[in-house]
Amino acid sequence: MGEMHWIIRHTQRLQWHRLLPLCLCLIVFMLHAPFSTLSAQESQTAYNFLRLPVSAHAAALGGDNISLVDDDATLIFQNPALINDVSDRTINLNFMTYMEGAKTASAAFLKAAGERGTWGVTAQYMDYGSMKETTADNQELGTFSARDIAIGGTFAYALTNELSGGVTAKFITSYIGSYNSLAVGVDLGLNYYHEDYDLSVSAVARNLGGQFKAYNDDFDRIPLDLQIGATKRIGQSPLRVSATMSRLNDWSEGFGRHFAIGADVLLGQSIYVAAGYNFRRASEMKISDAEGSSAHGAGLSLGAGLSLERFKLHVAYAKYHVSASSILINISYAL
C-alpha cells in the first residue's frame, strides 16, 4: 500500500514537472507586453466594448475580476480558465444598459469535455444606436448607426487538481455607417485554486491579436490587457475579498489606477451581495467644476445574485460612462 502511494505521488510530481515549463512560459509571455502597446491608451484602440465586464458578479466586484471561482457561465468572458466549475450544458444570456441609446447583449453556452475539460462558445453585441451624420461645416446629411460584434470559442483544461488553463479565440467586427473593420483576438488564462484555503489566484492576457481589415488605411490596435488577481475567503466567515490589477502592459498612468477591489458576502448557499471600487474608472470620469472635482459615484459598483441548482440570476449596478449609469443582468440555466 505504501509503495502504491509512493508511485502515485511520484507520477503526479512527474506530470507537474512536465506542465511547469508551459505554465512558466505563459506567465513570462504575459508579463512581457509588446513594446508597441506600452503607451497605448483606450482612445488609441478599437473595439473597446471588449473592456466592459459581462459577468454581473465580476462587475459588482469592481469590474475587472478574473479570480472568482463559481458555477457562473459569464466568467468565460473574464478568464477562460474559470469555466471548469460551471455546470455541464449551461446556457447564458446577458444584457446591459450603457450610455443613452446604446445597449449591449451577450450569450454563452458551455459543455463539459471529459473529466478535466470544458468548452464554450460566446457572442457579444453592442449597438450604439442612431447618430447624426454631418459634413465638415455641420450640415446634416441624415443618420448612421454603429455596432460591434465578437464571436468566440473557448477551451479550458484542469492541468492539475489546483491549476487550470484556458484559451479563447474570437473573431471581432465593427460597423460605423458604411465602414467596416475586422480583427482576431485571443484570451489566455491561468487559475490556481486551493480549496482548503479558499484561495484563488489568476493571470490573464486579454485581446492578443490585431486588425486584418481597417476602417480605412490606418490600422487600429485592439485593447490588449494583462491582468493578475486574487480572491480569498476570510476564514470561516461569509466574507470574501478580491483584488485585481489590470492593464499591466500600460504604465503611463499612476500605480493606484491599475487596481479594482471588491468584497462579497455569502448569505447561505444561494445568495450573495457584493460591492467594489475601480480606481481607474473613478479617475477617468472625474469632472471638475467651481466647487472642485468629483467622480459622481463612478468607480463604485454594487450587485447581488441568486444561485439555485440549475438557475442563476445576477444583477449589478455601476457607471461606465459619464452620461449614465448601467444595469447588468445575467441569466443562466443548466439544461
List each model region and its residues.
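Low-complexity, intrinsically disordered short peptide segments enriched in small/polar/basic residues
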Residues: 1-5, 24-27, 263
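A periodicity- and composition-biased signal for non-globular, repetitive helical segments
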Residues: 12, 19-24, 57
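Bacterial N-terminal signal peptides
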Residues: 21-34
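Subset of outer-membrane beta-barrel
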Residues: 41-335
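N-terminal secretory signal peptides that target proteins for export/translocation
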Residues: 1-17
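Sec/Tat signal peptide C-region and signal peptidase I cleavage site
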Residues: 35-40
